[in-house]
Amino acid sequence: MSKNILILNCGSSSLKFAILDPASGDEKLSGLAENFNLVDARIKWKLNGEKGAADLGAGAAHSEALNYIVKNILSAELKDSIGAIGHRIVHGGEKYTSSIVITDEVVAGIKEAAAFAPLHNPAHLIGIEEAFKAFPELKEKNVAVFDTAFHQTMPEHAYLYALPYSLYKEHGVRRYGFHGTSHYYVSREVAKVVGVEPSKVNVITCHLGNGASVAAIRNGKCIDTSMGFTPLEGLVMGTRSGDLDPAIIFFMHNTLGMSVKEIEETLVKKSGLLGLTEVTSDCRYAEDNYATHADAKRAMDGFCYRLAKYIGAYMAVLGDDHLDAIVFTGGIGENAGLVRELTLNYLKLFGIKVDSEKNTAARFGKSGEITAADSAFRAFVIPTNEELVIAQDTACLAL
């Protein structure tokens, strides 16, 4: 019997999990445990098409969630089918340029990179530790798959900030990029569609969800991306500001009297679509009310304008090379037709033309081209599948 891969994505207060067949991509189990360390900690899942849910108990966290999965959700047969465990790790720093089997040295490296991702990497380390306990027989078959790895091919002029060089050399202050697994996956998928070798494809990929980023990919390798030292840089996002004048931070602190913690909270959790609408971080609100509500229009226009600027910039970055495709993915990229249309309409100078009928049809998991036959460049919707990449990388290294 072929072996399946258990995929774990641990957040500070949640745990996403799935079991996939790495060969076929068939999903056997998926679920989410959330509200860790609160009175209403709970878990929900989908197993063989059937949904389930349960309370984990007040104060429950990663350990209780994994124990519940093993004891109450997995059948003996499904548990025995797990051949390895893949962990999504947000930040690998400069050290990790590809997925790797987890050893004590790798754990130390993830811990070291926690300085760059203090909300994420410590939670990933908890997930690794708990996976070792829950599946002791698979301790040497745990694999780390890094969000930052795909972007490690960026040239120096793309990843360095114009800061004192010592900040990079001594403290690692540089642009790292995120969503790498998603950008990698859709770049390979669109290469199949346009009939180009993955190692030769030139594409601009737009991963748009509550977190959002763009990547410029030349010959299958990332040469630039919109997120930077942290996932705060770049596009307008659900609650994150994206790019802004750094001096605004001084103003908020010196003139408005805001503390560093308050400023961080504002930029990370109270800005983006939420800040612009003053109502919600949900893009569906901005899309549904675009024609009638000033706040929705303000947020949608800001989101699409910023995105179009990045796409245009990356068309320039690709230089003399051709552009095979622009790809939209992620929850917003795959479903928000208005976002795609408004964004691409900013790029008419490049000869890009949207086919409204195709654009409207490409949603709810449907992939397809959304540009007209006479468009100078092609744009596609490609649903992402980060779990499949994690499963395949894990299988390659540990099975």
Curated annotation (Swiss-Prot):
* EC identifiers of the protein: 2.7.2.1
Q: Which GO terms describe its cellular component?
A: cytosol
- Keyword list, A-Z: ATP-binding, Cytoplasm, Kinase, Magnesium, Metal-binding, Nucleotide-binding, Transferase
Q: Which amino acids does the record list as binding substrate? A: 88
Q: In which pathway does it act?
A: Metabolic intermediate biosynthesis; acetyl-CoA biosynthesis; acetyl-CoA from acetate: step 1/2
Q: What class of enzyme is it?
A: transferase
Task: Name a GO molecular-function annotation.
Answer: magnesium ion binding
Instruction: Name the residues that bind Mg(2+).
Output: 9, 386
Q: Which InterPro entries match?
A: Ac/propionate_kinase, Aliphatic_acid_kin_short-chain, Aliphatic_acid_kinase_CS, ATPase_NBD
Tell me the active site.
Answer: 147
Q: How is the cofactor bound?
A: Mg(2+). Can also accept Mn(2+).
Question: What does the entry list as the binding residues for ATP?
Answer: 16, 207-211, 282-284, 331-335
Query: Which SUPFAM superfamilies does its entry note?
Result: Actin-like ATPase domain
Task: Give the protein family.
Answer: Belongs to the acetokinase family.
What's the protein called, per UniProt?
Acetate kinase
What organism is recorded for this protein? Glaesserella parasuis serovar 5 (strain SH0165) (Haemophilus parasuis)
Gene that encodes the chain: ackA
